[in-house]
Amino acid sequence: MPYLFAHFREKLTPDGEQIHLAVSKNGYDFTAVNGSKPVITCDKGEMGCRDIDVIRLKDNSFVFIATDLCIVNRMDENHNVNWADISSNGSKFISLWRSDDLVHFTPQELKYFGRDDFGCIWAPEIFYDETADDYIIHFSATVKADNFQKMAIYYTKTKDFENFTYPKLFFEKECGVFDSHLVKIDGTYHLFYKTSAKPLMNMHETSKDLFGTWQHDFDFQNYMASLYRPGSHEAATTYILPDGKWCLMLDFFGCEKEKMGYVPFISEKAGDAHFHQVNQLFSFPYGFKHGKVIEISDEEYEKILSFFNNKAGYASLRAD
């Protein structure tokens, strides 16, 4: 069963904060495409993107979305970043692209959800709600009401990625929360997120109702607390491996820049959030930063490899 891993790279040049792709035949060993160069390069907004998400729509086409943000372009001469300014004076748009075949992409679009009080919109992710036949985009944001002090998870609904409902609060805690990942398995919704304090780490909650009460997973919290530098993991994404095991990827940034990227955890059964770290079972050509893994067909896998491998000197796309 092949997989596509959409992600960005942490570099000191803007070409890292663009859309990069990798593929895998087995879900464990990933190969970069396009010579490890971007497949899509932003030409609007902040001229870069982070927190890449991709979903296969009902019509079998694809939508990519990402945070409209280029950290490199906001660094000072010493490579320092003012995160308080970025979270209170950031972009109020997300970036969006469409694709029918994962090798050709529409031009970048900036999508606005209609709220001027947001200080930023980070880590957007698409979840298909089959009960309402809606695509839900949930994302992290700060708001003016508390002087942009606490991040929470908001959501908007769409059916066509052109028209969006007014964003509402989806999930919050006493401290800030961000980097939400939402998946439904066997009738249970699983929400992964990261807290900003007390404690600073990734969390997991479950619910039988998407907009109902969430049950905190203390076993998951205790395991996360046992990790080396637990506060240096973020950006959860999950997928089911061909053998039925559940893979959780967490983006680790508690090291030098060239070693930053996703580290894998496995549970023996999809929906059972008792994970253990298994770095030795996976291989990556470089550090993959905040992204998304989806299943693709054998034909799509071969087409991606053939297209990009046969494009000598292929430049990342700004538009078809």
What is the predicted role of each segment?
Residues 1-320:
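Carbohydrate-active catalytic/glycan-binding domains of CAZyme proteins
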